[in-house]
Each structure stands twice: as structure tokens, then as C-alpha cells.
């Protein structure tokens, strides 16, 4: 069951959309959303390799701190507005049976903030990377490779998702990553109205999809199995079949090859990250 959701944010304009996803989950599971804003250190904003006088340095540090204060204040007010819109209670701590959210301010590198808070979160929500603007890739990587926790990648939407984790699809290939993804999202699967296992049936040296179906049925999950013909575009096939069955969320293991290898040469995970129009819960 999802009780604590981490949402790392920065002033890139993507926080509203990701909060809408996290809020939908918080309302569904009566969870607690921790919105963690990473404030850059003023020293890190100084020109690199350029000698500047002490008075100018002091002025720049002061101006940087003022800008950071304004950004923080604006984002905090935005959170309060969004919380009211989604009917979520502002609370520093989780309240049993109530959807709540809290704002925390950290200073330093975002990857360190994600490490520190993500390792004790049931789910980490991040924006779908924007390749054109070079935004979000490092956040997704930090959450996936440095926390050991499930990460929901949230696609850009004009409004809050009407359904989330209601009809869940599982991309299954029998791998360790896929097995871990199922194990770490059992609470989601058990609460879903419907679960569809998507598989090519080619689980080499791994648990087959029929066995996964039986495993989930033993836990009371309403699950069905859809096998499809294998192609060289597994990621594309997964997304097409998600649309075919009407799944609102996809769960899959992430980057069985290295992230760099999949990014350069292509791979199922990278295709899904680049092209998915539905939320995807990734587990590495």
C-alpha cells in the first residue's frame, strides 16, 4: 500500500502536473505526499573560473539568496493552492486515513535530496523527461538508481488523471527487474480493479507469465494474461497493448541493460520513457 510519496520539485514548471498525479494517489490510498524542493547553494551559482572582487561576490550571493527565497515562497504558495484544489490536508506528518501533504526545503544537489528522502518513500513521482529542454533525465536517473524504490514517471497532462492505478498493466519478461517491480508494487496490484499481464511468452530462464498470473491470483488480484507476438520494438508493443486493454498505468522493470547502453542503442525501457502517454511505475 502506498502511504508515503516523495515528489522532488524545482522551478521548471512541471511540479503542478506531477503533484496532480501524486495527489490522485494520495486521495486513493490516503497517503502522505512529501514535496521536496531542492534549493541551490548560492555558492554554486557563482561564475566558474572568473575572478571577482569580494564586494561583487557578496552582492551576487545576496541577490542569489533573494531570488531563491522568492522561488521558494512562490512554490510553497502554489502547493497550498493545489492541496486545496485536490482536497488534501496540509500536515508536516502523515495522518492515518487522511490524504495529506507537506513541504520541505533542502539545500544542495537534488540527487542527494532524492537519495536521502527517497529511500524511505513507498513511491517517488517525477516528471517525464523533456529531451528537447534537457530537463528531468537526471531526476529520473537519481530516483531509479539511487533509492531502490519504485518511481512513477508522470506524462504531461492538461488536467489531473481521472484514473490512476485502477487498471494496471505489467510488462513481464521474467527478469529480476520485472520480478522486483511486481514485488514492490503488490499493494498497488492488490488494490487495482483489474490487472493485465503483458508478455511475449519468451521468459528465458525466468518465471513465466502463467506462473505470475497464478501468483497474483493467490493474492486475490483480478488478473488476466495477454501474450503478444515478439518484435524488435518491445517498448512500442507494450504501449500499444496498454492502449488496447485500456490500462491507465504500466508497471515494469527498468533498464536491465545499463541506462547509457539503452539510451545510445535503444531498449524497451528507453522507448517507454520517451513515448509513454500514461504513467509508468519503473523499478530497477
Q: Which residues make up each language-model segment?
A:
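Small/aliphatic-rich secondary-structure junction motif
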Residues: 1-61, 146, 156, 164-229
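Short beta->alpha connector loops
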Residues: 12-13, 107-111, 131-132, 175-176, ...
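Gly/Ser-rich helix-loop-strand patches that form or flank binding pockets
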Residues: 15, 19, 26, 111-161, ...
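Hydrophobic/aromatic beta-strand patches that form the interior of the parallel beta-sheet core
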Residues: 34-36, 104, 125, 152, ...
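Structural beta-alpha unit
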Residues: 40-43, 73, 81-124, 219-250, ...
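A short acidic, glycine-rich active-site loop
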Residues: 57-74
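Electropositive phosphate-/nucleotide-binding environments in soluble metabolic enzymes
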Residues: 69, 73-76, 108, 179, ...
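Short, small-residue-enriched loops and turns at beta-alpha junctions
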Residues: 132, 202-206, 231-232, 258-259
Amino acid at each position: 500500500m502506498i502511504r508515503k510519496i516523495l515528489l522532488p520539485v524545482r522551478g521548471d514548471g512541471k511540479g503542478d502536473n506531477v503533484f496532480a498525479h501524486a495527489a490522485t494517489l494520495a486521495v486513493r490510498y490516503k497517503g502522505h505526499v512529501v514535496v521536496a524542493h531542492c534549493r541551490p547553494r548560492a555558492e554554486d551559482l557563482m561564475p566558474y573560473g572568473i575572478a571577482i572582487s569580494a564586494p561583487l561576490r557578496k552582492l551576487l550571493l545576496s541577490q542569489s539568496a533573494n531570488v531563491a527565497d522568492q522561488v521558494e515562497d512562490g512554490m510553497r504558495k502554489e502547493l497550498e493552492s493545489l492541496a486545496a484544489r485536490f482536497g488534501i490536508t496540509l500536515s508536516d506528518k502523515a495522518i492515518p486515513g487522511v490524504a495529506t501533504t507537506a513541504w520541505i526545503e533542502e539545500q544542495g544537489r537534488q540527487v542527494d535530496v532524492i537519495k536521502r528522502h527517497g529511500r524511505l518513500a513507498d513511491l517517488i513521482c517525477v516528471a517525464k523527461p523533456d529531451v528537447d529542454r534537457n530537463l528531468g533525465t537526471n531526476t529520473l536517473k537519481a530516483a531509479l538508481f539511487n533509492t531502490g524504490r519504485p518511481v512513477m514517471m508522470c506524462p504531461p497532462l492538461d488536467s489531473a488523471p481521472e484514473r490512476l492505478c485502477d487498471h494496471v498493466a505489467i510488462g513481464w519478461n521474467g527478469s529480476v527487474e520485472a520480478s522486483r517491480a511486481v514485488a514492490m508494487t503488490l499493494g498497488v496490484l492488490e488494490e487495482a480493479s483489474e490487472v493485465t499481464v503483458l508478455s511475449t511468452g519468451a521468459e528465458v530462464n525466468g518465471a513465466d507469465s502463467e506462473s505470475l498470473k497464478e501468483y497474483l491470483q493467490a493474492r486475490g488480484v483480478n488478473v488476466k494474461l495477454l501474450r503478444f507476438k515478439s518484435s524488435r520494438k518491445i517498448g512500442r508493443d507494450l504501449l500499444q497493448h496498454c492502449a488496447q486493454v485500456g490500462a491507465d498505468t504500466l508497471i515494469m522493470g527498468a533498464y536491465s541493460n545499463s541506462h547509457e547502453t539503452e539510451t545510445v542503442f535503444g531498449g524497451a525501457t528507453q522507448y517507454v520513457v520517451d513515448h509513454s502517454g500514461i504513467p509508468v511505475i519503473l523499478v530497477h
